[in-house]
Amino acid sequence: MTTVAIPKLPIRPIGPGDVDAVCSLERLCFKDPYSPHFISQLAQANSDTFLVAVVNGDLVGYAVVNRGSNHNHLVSIAVHPNNRRGGIARRLLAALEERLEKGRLFRLEVRKSNLPAIEFYRGQGFQETRVIEGYYSDGEDAVVMERNLRKEPGLSTQSCTQV
């Protein structure tokens, strides 16, 4: 696996032409990827909180949040394997945080076996709050992680370029 550090990273809302690339990334990154129909629905319902990261014209990452009545829910985040460990996921989360109401709960679920992701989220200030048994279609448990969005400016996005 190649690790690429990217000093400037264009992050922008998903566009109609991005859905196929997001679906390809879903299939590459997840055992049980979301369907193209579901990705399209997410894009329509969350147009301002479905962000994509682009490197040299290629979509290399995305993150999407649903705004709920009492919390923000990270539905999915993915980075192409060749672009991991370069700060893309951290920058996507930071860019999302800037768009979300401060002082609210930010929640996600992650596979219990996905220890690198759990460590990443811990590093972003998330704490494990509970386990949901049999959450995933293959029967694997999910770890629920949460944190409050800071009322002051969030994670550093100085090296992000939002379009």
Language model features: what each stretch is:
Residues 1-4, 141-163:
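Terminal substrate-recognition subdomain of acyl/acetyltransferases
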Residues 7-22:
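A short beta-loop-alpha structural element at the N-terminal edge
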Residues 52, 58-66, 71-78:
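Conserved beta-strand in the GNAT
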Residues 77-84, 110-113:
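A short, internal acetyl-CoA/4′-phosphopantetheine-binding micro-motif in the GNAT/acyltransferase core
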Residues 79, 85-98, 119-123:
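Conserved acetyl-CoA-binding loop-helix of GNAT-fold acetyltransferases
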Residues 89, 93, 114-117, 134-139:
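Short glycine/proline-centered loop/turn elements that form peptide/ligand docking sites
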Residues 93, 100-112:
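Conserved GNAT acetyl-CoA-binding A-motif
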Residues 107-109, 122, 127-143, 163:
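Conserved catalytic-core motifs of GNAT/GCN5-like acyltransferases
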